Amino acid sequence: MRLLLLSVFLAACSATSSAPAPAVTAAAPPAAADSTDLPNAVATETLTPTPIRVTVDDLPEPYASESARKGPDVVDVPASPVLRVPAGFAVQVWADGLDSPRWLALAPDGSVLLAASRENTILRLQDADGDGVAEARETFATAANGLDLPMGMAFADGAFFVGNTGDVRRYPYAPGQGRLEGTGTVVAELPGRGYNQHWTRNVVASPDGDSLYVTVGSETNVDPEELPRASVFRITPDGAGRQTVSFGLRNPVGLAFHPATGTPYTTVNERDLLGDGLVPDYLTSIGLDADGEPRFYGWPYTYLTPDNLDPRRLDGGRSERPDLAARTVTPDVLFESHSAALGLDFYPTGATRAGGAATFPARYHGGAFVAFRGSWNRDEGTGYKVAFAPFEDGRAVGHYEDFLTGFLVDPSGPTTWGRPVGVLVLPDGSLLVTEEANGRIYRVSYVG
């Protein structure tokens, strides 16, 4: 598999206190700053962006290597950590001392919601004084509000929605509301839990607010399953009109709409135990085909093309489902196998200076940022970083680049002090990145 390397990005910032955090208030516009002026700054080294292109033609045969089971050895944050980002970017610790922070959502009032999924808690945070550190922190919802491994969060139709592992719930919401009330109304029942980490359920509102898109991962590695497993479907905000958008997606997690085209995209964790080089995770658009049928992306019968048959799903040397195998769509951007691609967000198109803060250079506008949580099913560890996938004219170019790296200490272990999960572009043009292992949120900003 050929890999070329390109990197771009990261800044982070953090705040902890033994005293109760102040209530969230309206944020002041942040002022542009040199990285040396930023509070909670993380030391950085310059990373030179280089394209990484994984193609179907480069893939090895199944079982070309052993399938290792090497989960990471997660260590504490170093006393003097150093992260690598492209020139001109700075990193701060935006928030610290968190319990397994996973997913992020921007509330209508500008505050940031954080799903600490394993704690069945959603926090509400904000950088009220605009210095790049979230000093305001309060509890927005807990298990008492019906949370059960919450992840995706969305706002639509004057309401707040959360994706639990077993359902999607709707709650009354008013901008600026500091805490959810009640246990909400279930608008979609879902199959709960799943294989390894496949309990995550993302929920995102369409740009027009008329639909909610929901992701559901598989329950197994490669066993055939009934929908809605391994699919993305959509419903109206009141739960009606369920329609499968795409399926054969082993574990779709990240979900976002391109800012220029409105096309939905998802990140997918592909299957295990075929060797180090199979199967690449990916970023792809989703939707209906020319016949109005949901697109099929291969799982569990094929991978990436109709010709790549999974050897575990054969019958007499042929695919168990030749009808579906023939429909397999090739994804837009392939990632190195076992990277564990999770969080996804697009940088706005036509972004300019916002509130006096320098936004990212034009080459990032309309492109996708993806968090790689990192491998467990590979001899040499991979992932543990944030990548950037360039787009041109609203379409993926086909390669990706490293944007924020430095967490992975030793790939042979692997040993790491960071497992990025969620990403969120803020109105000021900076990027937030959740790091689950050591309980931080990093902020990446462009300081020129």
Give the positions of each predicted feature.
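A short beta-strand motif characteristic of beta-propeller blades
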Residues: V91-D96, R137-A143, T185-R193, G241-S246, ...
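Acidic carboxylate motifs that coordinate Ca2+ or other divalent cations, activating on Asp/Glu
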Residues: D131
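Beta-propeller domain segments
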Residues: D37-P86, S218-T220, A230, I235-A240, ...
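Beta-rich, blade/repeat-based domains predominating
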Residues: G97-D109, A143-A159, G163, R193-S211, ...
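Asp-box/WD-like beta-propeller blade repeats and closely related beta-sheet repeat scaffolds
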Residues: A136-A154, T165-P207, T215-S218, G241
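C-terminal motif of bacterial Sec signal peptides marking the signal peptidase cleavage site
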Residues: L10-A12
